[in-house]
């Protein structure tokens, strides 16, 4: 006998749309508040978007990220990111790290003298350390990365809209895109409010959130489309409630299993990936909310064409009066 785990009873009848104006208004408020936080507080851009210097280190000793960071704390260099690099092609005694130092103003990166101070500070931790390369990213390149990131998110939303439009109807596409914009904007608003570092990994997290959110939305939309055919005389609101209730167990299980992995990474993953994991963790939660209370509310307000093709009353009677 197959064992199926169900978090909800077979028949649930939760009215998700009893306060549709309130939930929709709350979603709009979240978007507006996030936009205000973004425009007034700004984002705490990382080195990728602000510019800076990257120093590659190599040593025969194991990389001690904590010791490297402690040695550089007294240099007054601002934003510093240290990550160990792993590659199957490295020798057994080849240990590589990347030290990224953010630009301290909008016009230039750190000076050669400061780079020398960084190298000397790291040599006090590991005398065998070497510095094969030093690369700097200027504000112009950082600005291009910002534009590319915006284009990537916009292209993802546009592609998803076209897909939903072709598979369902334009009302579904509009609801889906509104939910995606809601998810991205609210997540960015949280980053602005708490001044969490925003870099290229955060953009990757936002794209991941878009994929998760649209997957959750499409599952309910697909069930809604089936039920619209099955229950042709049932009011649209009741059909939508039925569809959300029928997929509720799947939605909760997907969310919980995803959060188990993400919370573990958030707690034990360390500082390097914390911003990335936080963006996904918050995004999947807000995405689950928006898939019901943003996307479905818009479809409910716009309505759905349930008439289908009209039958021809003369069909099949063309030859009724012809004598045999």
UniProtKB/Swiss-Prot annotation:
Localization of this protein: Cell inner membrane
Source organism per UniProt: Cereibacter sphaeroides (strain ATCC 17023 / DSM 158 / JCM 6121 / CCUG 31486 / LMG 2827 / NBRC 12203 / NCIMB 8253 / ATH 2.4.1.) (Rhodobacter sphaeroides)
Name this protein carries in UniProt: Protein translocase subunit SecF
HAMAP family linked: SecF_B
GO molecular function: protein-transporting ATPase activity
GO biological process: intracellular protein transmembrane transport; protein targeting; protein transport by the Sec complex
Membrane topology: Multi-pass membrane protein
Location, primary (coarse class): membrane
UniProt similarity note: Belongs to the SecD/SecF family. SecF subfamily.
Quaternary structure and interacting proteins, as annotated: Forms a complex with SecD. Part of the essential Sec protein translocation apparatus which comprises SecA, SecYEG and auxiliary proteins SecDF-YajC and YidC.
Keywords on record: Cell inner membrane, Cell membrane, Membrane, Protein transport, Translocation, Transmembrane, Transmembrane helix, Transport
SUPFAM superfamilies per UniProt: Multidrug efflux transporter AcrB transmembrane domain
GO CC annotation terms, alphabetical: plasma membrane
Signal peptide region: none
Cross-referenced Pfam families: Sec_GG (PF07549), SecD_SecF_C (PF02355)
Superkingdom, natural source: Bacteria
Role according to the record: Part of the Sec protein translocase complex. Interacts with the SecYEG preprotein conducting channel. SecDF uses the proton motive force (PMF) to complete protein translocation after the ATP-dependent function of SecA.
Membrane spanning stretches: 16-36, 145-165, 174-194, 201-221, 247-269, 276-295
